[in-house]
Design a protein with these regions (language model features):
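Glycine-rich phosphate/pyrophosphate-binding loop at beta-loop-alpha junctions
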Residues: 1-71, 116-124, 128-164
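Active-site-adjacent helical/loop segments in soluble small-molecule enzymes
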Residues: 7, 57-125
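Short beta->alpha junction loops/turns
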Residues: 22, 85, 107, 135, ...
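A generic structural signal for well-ordered coil/turn residues at beta-strand boundaries
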Residues: 47, 76, 97, 105, ...
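A conserved regulatory-domain signal marking ACT and ACT-like small-molecule sensing domains
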Residues: 139-205
Length: 205
């Protein structure tokens, strides 16, 4: 997709910059650009399955490297924006909130990348476009995405905590949170002296 967009913009709008975005567990373009040759990733993450490839294609890689902008530099920025699962889930929610459409993880990567790029570079007053490339969503995956969205939006933090296995420990833990909401709580008995707690905490704005 990015090679085709770069080739087209190189002809009709060479002043436009193309910002590559990849899922951080299958970043084959980033690896190839850093090595200046195509490489095979040892493993790829399958959450964004539409872009889960271990090696970028030969011709797309050539197009990405050779396509020039109007200032004779590469039209595709050499620094790939990497997005993680939580950021992709948040972008899926953003798309739904704005358009009432559900996109697949790979389809939401571009929006997740724009959000991250804008935040990191402090960009204001610029026209930026994300290309939604797919909506092949498995319904069973929606619950997982909904749960991860709060993390991606920095509205929830997940902690693994060890507390004493004794009366009053949970109350003391809640008091230590100073009024923050507990969004999730999982307890597993491990031994007689300590309890392992997996807890989600709502973050204040």
């Amino acid at each position: 997709l990015i090679a085709g967009v770069a080739a087209y913009l190189g002809d009709v709008a060479p002043h436009v910059k193309v910002i590559p975005v990849e899922y951080d567990e299958s970043a084959c373009l980033k690896a190839a650009l850093e090595a200046n040759e195509r490489v095979i990733l040892p493993s790829v993450g399958l959450f964004a399955d539409g872009t889960a490839v271990a090696q970028i294609g030969e011709k797309p890689f050539d197009v990405i490297r050779l396509q020039k902008s109007d200032n004779s530099g590469p039209i595709v920025e050499p620094n790939v924006v990497l997005v993680n699962t939580d950021e992709v889930c948040a972008a899926i929610k953003d798309t739904y909130d704005e358009c009432r459409s559900i996109v697949e993880p790979s389809g939401a990567m571009a929006l997740a990348g724009i959000k991250k790029y804008v935040a990191e570079h402090g960009i204001e007053g610029k026209n930026m476009v994300s290309i939604v490339c797919g909506a092949n969503m498995n319904f069973d995956r929606l619950r997982y995405i909904a749960e991860r969205t709060e993390l991606g939006e920095r509205k929830e933090a997940i902690f693994a905590v060890t507390i004493p296995e004794q009366k009053g420990s949970f109350l003391s833990f809640c008091r230590a949170l100073q009024g923050r909401n507990i969004t999730e709580f999982n307890y597993r008995a491990s031994d007689a002296s300590a309890a392992q707690v997996f807890v989600g905490i709502s973050l204040k704005n």
